[in-house]
Design a protein with these regions (language model features):
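Pre-Walker A (Motif I) flank of P-loop NTPase domains
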Residues: 2-7, 77
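Residues at the beta-strand->loop junction immediately N-terminal to the Walker
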Residues: 10
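The conserved Walker
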Residues: 13
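Conserved lysine of the Walker
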Residues: 17
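Post-Walker A alpha-helix
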Residues: 20-21, 25
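Conserved nucleotide-sensing/catalytic segment adjacent to the nucleotide-binding pocket
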Residues: 32-35, 41-84
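Small-molecule kinase domains that catalyze NTP-dependent phosphoryl transfer to phosphate-bearing small molecules
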Residues: 89, 124-170
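Conserved phosphate-donor/acceptor-positioning beta-strand/loop module used by diverse small-molecule
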Residues: 96-117
């Protein structure tokens, strides 16, 4: 039986988590990717309101669907890469994690990436509304998230580095070999 190495990649939305995880998955053939976004956990009725401070909100998210898939994959793959915004902070997942990586990307880049990714076919009014929300509340949520989640990450990488450099840095720092 294989004992899985469980690597969580964390960061704010549009920070580069998914891109890095997909590249790790290509590099490590005997791996599985589990992504928080695939479960719409933040849309469950039990999810805390967005304005709830991340320190209070993190363990209010119901991870049972994600955990079910994780536990069925655990020890069947050499590596499990989890695209998960909260690093070690959720008690349901924490004890299974081998290492966490926090992708720290400047918030102006995050904002621009999110507009390009999520608003490319939206109206000017919708883009302007998102910009107002970002300035009024989302930016502070992202700042709080970054501080709280990155404080106990095993590795913090610069999200502005080219992907190949990020991959090389993660592999070297975490001593990952395929």
């Amino acid at each position: 039986m294989t004992k899985s190495i469980v690597i969580v990649i964390s960061g704010v939305t549009a920070g580069g988590k998914t891109t890095l995880i997909n590249e790790l998955h290509k590099e490590f053939i005997d791996s599985k990717v589990i992504s928080f976004d695939d479960y719409s956990i933040d849309a469950f009725p039990s999810a805390p309101p967005i304005e709830t401070p991340v320190q209070e909100a993190v363990n209010q998210y119901d991870l049972r669907p994600l955990m079910k898939d994780f536990l069925s994959a655990k020890d069947r793959f050499s590596f499990i890469f989890i695209d998960f915004p909260f690093g070690y902070k959720h008690t349901m997942l924490e004890s299974y994690i081998t290492k966490t990586v926090y992708v720290k990307t400047p918030l102006d880049i995050v904002f621009a990436r999110q507009i390009v990714r999520d608003y490319y076919n939206k109206s000017t009014e919708e883009i302007t509304n998102w910009a107002k929300i970002y300035l009024d509340s989302a930016r502070q949520i992202f700042t709080d998230h970054e501080y709280f989640v990155s404080e106990d990450a095993d590795l913090i990488i610069d999200g502005t580095l080219p992907l190949a450099e990020q991959l090389k840095f993660v592999k070297k720092a975490l001593q990952l070999k395929n």
